[in-house]
């Protein structure tokens, strides 16, 4: 059975495609994983920055807290 030139070219293309496809798929998965990791890191950094800003804005009136605690201690009989 003789192969025509076109059949030979198609066979070579098929073999090359079969050899290259797993490599391309693995590379695509690796790139997607790296992109997902980078996006998750960016989200975590944004949340941490927002939380730090929120905590920095909280003003605790320590004098009132102390008065409340001292008053509570006196109410139960402790100095």
From Swiss-Prot:
Residues 1-26 form the signal peptide. The keyword Transmembrane does not apply. The keyword Signal applies. The modification Valine amide is found at residue 76. This is the most abundant peptide from the venom of T.bicarinatum. InterPro entries: Pilosulin. It comes from Tetramorium bicarinatum. Its main location: secreted. The C-terminal amidation is important for antimicrobial activity, since a non-amidated synthetic peptide shows a reduced antimicrobial activity (2-20-fold depending on the strain tested). The amidation may play a positive role in the peptide conformation, since amidated peptide shows an increase of about 5% of helical content. It is found in: Secreted; Target cell membrane. Keywords: Amidation, Antibiotic, Antimicrobial, Membrane, Secreted, Signal, Target cell membrane, Target membrane. It comes from the Eukaryota. GO terms for cellular component: extracellular region; membrane; other organism cell membrane. Antimicrobial peptide that shows antimicrobial activities against all microorganisms tested with minimal inhibitory concentrations (MICs) values ranging from 0.45 to 97.5 umol/L. This peptide kills the microorganisms by permeabilizating the membranes. It shows a very weak hemolytic activity (HC(50)=325 umol/L) and weak cytotoxicity against human lymphocytes (LC(50)=67.8 umol/L). Gram-negative bacteria tested are E.coli (MIC=24.4 umol/L), C.sakazakii (MIC=5.8 umol/L), P.aeruginosa (MIC=8.7-12.2 umol/L), S.enterica (MIC=5.4 umol/L), and H.pylori (MIC=0.99-3.9 umol/L). GO terms for biological process: defense response to bacterium. Belongs to the formicidae venom precursor-01 superfamily. Expressed by the venom gland. Residues 27-56 form a propeptide. This is M-myrmicitoxin(01)-Tb1a.
